[in-house]
Every structure is written in structure tokens, then in C-alpha cells.
Amino acid sequence: KVYQANGVPRCLGLALTNLSACIHLFIMSLMLYVAAPLVFNAKTPENPGAYFFCLAVYMAVSLGVASVIGLAVKDPAKTPMLSIAVFLPSTILSGIMFPTALLPKGLAILGRMFPAFWGYGIMTDSTCQPEKLLPLLAMFILAVFACILLLGKTDT
């Protein structure tokens, strides 16, 4: 709304918001990448180049989904609630918080519909396997098309 009030095109507002979020997420990821081995005695990825590529792919998909939510929900007070409704189950059902083997089969299958499942899978592998990137690519393409459609709609 602030961008519209000042005459800034919605697509520029979307691009700037995503750029800012991407920079912040990357800085946080770098901090965790450095701190995790020191604080938690975690292993560093065997192939840092593949790890950061997979991180960039996962961030792009997550920001795409967040962009769809931001463009689709007209009431700013409802946007965080819908984001929580999408991203919290994504985290819970992906295997990040606990192994998916502990979930009932139906919930484990449902978890595969969320980006976090595939993002976690590619980031924990030592190599970035193309067959694990395809679902994320499909989600990203769907998010881009949804954003294009939502940007094309006029506000009423």
C-alpha cells in the first residue's frame, strides 16, 4: 500500500521486498553456517558451492510462495496469519524439526507438498541432485505465474 500511495509500480515493490528478504536470509544463513560448527559441533557441508546453490534455490522458492501470499491477501493484518498457516506446517512436516519417519504416513506424504521438505533434502545431501531440484523448480514456476497473475489484477 505504501508503494502504491507514492506511485511506485507494484512489481517494483515486490522486487525490492524480495531483494531485501533475500539479502537478510543470506546474511542469516552465513552467520549460521559459521556459528553452527562452533556452537553445536555441527559438520560443515562437504561441498559448500553446492550447499549455497541449493540454499539459493530454496530461498527463491520460499520467497516466491511468500510473494504469492503477500499479493493474494489484501488485508495486511491477515498476511502473517496465512504465512504462519503455510510455513509452520512446512517446517513441521519436512523433517527439519524431527524425522519424517515419526510422522503418520498421510502427514509424511502431505509434507512433500511443501518447499521445506525438498529444500531440506537438497541441503542435507552432499551433492545437489537434479531430481530433487525438479519439485522446487515446479513450485517456483507456479509461484512466478501466480505472482504475474496477481500483479496483473487491478485493485478494487
Name these PLM-found stretches:
Residues 2-10:
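Short helix-to-coil transition segments within interhelical loops
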